[in-house]
């Protein structure tokens, strides 16, 4: 099992309500995008940290492997600036909302001191500007440990602990 980091921003509400992740197969220029292509690597049981508006707001678990699926109706109707291709990658997920969302800026200094070009954060500790990113074990462990200290919901804690077990 793997752990990923998704930047949902403008589509978080729709994806959360629908219990899925969705990304177009091609960007608006008709090219493949590494953040969209990475969706194909999500498999049943993988963990995803959900980032929206500068906060990690949930952890989700993939219910199935990624599959090809047209853009969900609610995303087409959402008031966003994005005009996506209709063909996309879809993963049904179970969201576990963080009662105490984590501001990514709260651990920015740690990320700057522990950079990794293969992770979801740039050298300045900011989330990379792409939809889906890999999350290195070291970065995942740090974020999960911080979140575990804050969360008191037993179900959310259990999911975080399960994700942490993968990082050992």
Describe these PLM feature segments:
Residues 55-61:
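Short, Lys/Arg- and Gly-enriched loop/turn segments at beta-strand edges
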């Amino acid at each position: 099992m793997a752990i990923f980091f998704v930047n949902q921003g403008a589509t978080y509400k729709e994806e959360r309500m629908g219990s899925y992740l969705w990304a177009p197969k091609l960007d608006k220029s008709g090219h493949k995008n590494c953040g969209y292509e990475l969706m194909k690597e999500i498999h049943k049981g993988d963990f995803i940290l959900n980032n929206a508006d500068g906060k990690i707001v949930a952890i989700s678990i993939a219910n199935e492997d990624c599959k090809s699926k047209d853009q969900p109706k609610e995303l087409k109707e959402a008031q966003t600036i994005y005009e996506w291709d209709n063909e996309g990658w879809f993963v049904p997920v179970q969201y576990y909302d963080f009662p105490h969302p984590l501001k990514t800026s709260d651990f920015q200094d740690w990320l700057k001191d522990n950079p990794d070009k293969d992770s979801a954060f740039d050298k300045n500790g900011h989330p990379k500007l792409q939809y889906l990113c890999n999350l290195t074990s070291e970065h995942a462990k740090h974020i999960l440990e911080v979140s575990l200290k804050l969360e008191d919901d037993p179900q959310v804690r259990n999911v975080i602990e399960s994700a942490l077990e993968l990082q050992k």
